[in-house]
Regions:
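Catalytic toxin/effector domains delivered as secreted proteins or via bacterial secretion systems
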Residues: 3-164
Length: 164
């Protein structure tokens, strides 16, 4: 219901803040669920790791979360495939370098990037610095880890210039 309301607010008022909150809530629940499912699939031999079980689990979680988030947005009439403010697993260009490169956050809602991960990340992590270098210049990167991992499972990294 809250997610629906956030979608209506986006359509009518153009305000992305409620959708940012609901995206976080939804992605956290999906990451938790996909973590349990992924572990069960690995134990049953239905997911074959290339390098490690951890890599296979992370890839499984990413795919599941992105698929479910796309479906959720689609069911609410929110386009995630174009160049709009809501995107799922889309290239975000970095054109400030000599040649254009890109980063691919799991999701983006306006100026917030979302990254689902098994590992803790900081501003020193190349991927996070890369997100901040993208042309859409996010104000924050939300790190979402399955709660089953314990500790700091979800947190926000603020753009460095905004801390001043």
């Amino acid at each position: 219901m809250r997610f629906q309301r956030a979608a209506v607010i986006l359509r009518i008022k153009g305000d992305t803040k409620p959708l940012q909150v609901e995206t976080f809530r939804f992605v956290q629940l999906q990451a938790d669920s996909a973590y349990e499912q992924g572990l069960a699939h690995i134990r049953a031999g239905r997911v074959k790791p290339r390098l490690s079980d951890s890599e296979a689990l992370g890839n499984y979680i990413d795919r599941q979360v992105r698929t479910r988030l796309r479906e959720q947005y689609s069911n609410l009439g929110i386009d995630t495939s174009g160049s709009g403010p809501v995107r799922v697993n889309r290239r975000e260009n970095i054109s400030s370098e000599n040649e254009t490169t890109y980063r691919r956050p799991d999701a983006r809602v306006d100026k917030i990037a979302f990254d689902v991960t098994l590992t803790e990340k900081t501003l020193k992590t190349a991927q996070i610095r890369g997100f901040f270098d993208t042309d859409f210049r996010p104000s924050h990167v939300v790190i979402i880890r399955p709660r089953q991992l314990g500790g700091r499972y979800s947190y926000i990294i603020t753009r460095p210039e905004m801390n001043r």
